[in-house]
């Protein structure tokens, strides 16, 4: 199952390392990533495979929320199927 992780907040050292570290810890494979700094704001989108994630979807959201709070950033996890359903893909 594919999902998108988006990260937005003030640019600080270690953002990519911490988010990718959590992915590694939870057996989430990062398939693609893009990031940019926009006037001092960090923005990143990761396409990930969560099919072998070692925790439930609910616990994954909790862990992402906890990391976001620690870092003072916004982190969202959205399954690709949400977007596919909106455009009529199965």
Name each model feature, range by range.
Residues 1-90:
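A conserved regulatory-domain signal marking ACT and ACT-like small-molecule sensing domains
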